[in-house]
From Swiss-Prot:
Subunit structure: Component of the ARISC complex, at least composed of UIMC1/RAP80, ABRAXAS1, BRCC3/BRCC36, BABAM2 and BABAM1/NBA1. Component of the BRCA1-A complex, at least composed of BRCA1, BARD1, UIMC1/RAP80, ABRAXAS1, BRCC3/BRCC36, BABAM2 and BABAM1/NBA1. In the BRCA1-A complex, interacts directly with ABRAXAS1, BRCC3/BRCC36 and BABAM1/NBA1. Binds polyubiquitin. Component of the BRISC complex, at least composed of ABRAXAS2, BRCC3/BRCC36, BABAM2 and BABAM1/NBA1. Identified in a complex with SHMT2 and the other subunits of the BRISC complex.
A Pfam family of this chain: BRE
Name this protein carries in UniProt: BRISC and BRCA1-A complex member 2
Organism field: Chlorocebus aethiops (Green monkey)
Domain note: Contains 2 ubiquitin-conjugating enzyme family-like (UEV-like) regions. These regions lack the critical Cys residues required for ubiquitination but retain the ability to bind ubiquitin.
Protease among keywords: no
Similarity annotation: Belongs to the BABAM2 family.
Length: 383
């Protein structure tokens, strides 16, 4: 159900509270997922004119789970705070004295419900952390992370239900990784969606038993960051080592991700240097180039009255990854009606060369390769 459809069914006096939750409500580490409501119902009599819904189920993303809490207002007394039912978490009993925004409920503030929900989620986090005391191993993992502010202040924990047969229970740690994405080139962060939210990397680590014999890590990147780093398949984090612990493993993942970001930033500046060198060496032979991301360059060249194009595609992780050179005849066509072309990656190249050296080496390579390309174009293409 879309936020607009839901809001149209809410009692008008309660609508400002709900609107603030579904339109602006982001709670916890996962900034890519908003709060949402379902199961709208009314406690009013059938004679009450609509819209009159005053109770609903609130879905809250937390530590890779979705909490489903019932929120119950009274449309007849909209100035009163709501009641809460915490679904399956029957052991979760919030401390009322710590719920300042509930105790001092201000119906003139549209965000008062959202503020109460945030306080409840904080208490729910403390409740889940307290459950780890049943396992000395999981408590060790939690306490060692807590001692590091960069991890301890950006962590959510969910302890699963205890197995009645074994007495074991699973637990999931969700951490917001302290990785700086601010220097990623802006062109890579465009066109993902209209409201991408915060740029964030979340590491989820699931312990399937209290002795950490089965541990499953997974990295989640916000849409813009995933796109900027080359897609979901571009980054593979290491398996959790047997006998390892989170305080050693999490920095490894941070280091891996930081290096990946640096590769992208370095690649952008190196591609710009590369294209600047080609503009200098080939001058009017440059037909077009990508002036934003510096990922493509096209040259129009001539060798002994034979004109040809060279399309240069620079990869995201240039100069580590070698550019592709595609030679294209301006005269000859394939059977499918395309200009005859050959792609080359087997040519002299070193990622240690600067842009000027790469341009000089490319010019020398063009002279040696073009004769055989011309011969192949005449042999295999059609005028």
């Amino acid at each position: 159900m879309s936020p607009e459809v839901a809001l149209n069914r809410i009692s008008p006096m309660l609508s400002p509270f709900i609107s603030s939750v579904v339109r602006n409500g982001k709670v916890g580490l996962d900034a890519t997922n908003c709060l949402r409501i379902t199961d709208l119902k009314s406690g009013c009599t059938s004679l009450t004119p609509g819209p009159n819904c005053d109770r609903f189920k609130l879905h809250i993303p937390y530590a890779g789970e979705t909490l489903k809490w019932d929120i119950i207002f009274n449309a007849q007394y909209p100035e009163l705070p709501p009641d809460f039912i915490f679904g399956e978490d029957v052991e979760f009993l919030p401390d009322p004295s710590a719920l300042q925004n509930l105790a001092s409920w201000n119906p003139s503030n549209p965000e008062c419900l959202l503020l109460v929900v945030k306080e409840l989620v904080q208490q729910y986090h403390q409740f889940q952390c307290s459950r780890l005391r049943e396992s000395s191993r999981l408590m060790f993992e939690y306490q060692t992370l807590l001692e590091e502010p960069q991890y301890g202040e950006n962590m959510e924990i969910y302890a699963g239900k205890k197995n009645n047969w074994t007495g074991e229970f699973s637990a999931r740690f969700l951490l917001k990784l302290p990785v700086d994405f601010s220097n990623i080139p802006t062109y890579l962060l465009k066109d993902v969606n209209e409201d991408p939210g915060e740029d964030v990397a979340l590491l989820s680590v699931s312990f399937e038993d209290t002795e950490a014999t089965q541990v499953y890590p997974k990295l989640y990147l916000s849409p813009r960051i995933e796109h900027a780093l080359g897609g979901s398949s571009a980054l593979h984090i290491p398996a959790f080592p047997g006998g390892g612990c989170l305080i050693d493993y999490v920095p490894q993942v941070c280091h891996l991700l930081t290096n990946k970001v640096q590769y992208v930033i370095q690649g952008y500046h190196k591609r710009r240097e590369y294209i600047a060198a080609f503009l200098s060496h080939f001058g009017t032979g440059v037909v077009e180039y990508d002036a934003e991301g510096f990922t493509k360059l096209t040259l129009l060249l001539m060798w002994k009255d034979f004109c040809f194009l060279v399309h240069i595609d620079l990869p995201l992780f240039f100069p580590r990854d070698q550019p592709t050179l595609t030679f294209q005849s301006v005269y000859h066509f394939t059977n499918s009606g395309q200009l005859y072309s050959q792609a080359q990656k087997n040519y002299p190249y070193s990622p240690r060369w600067d842009g000027n050296e790469m341009a000089k080496r490319a010019k020398a390579y063009f002279k040696t390769f073009v004769p055989q390309f011309q011969e192949a174009a005449f042999a295999n293409g059609k005028l």
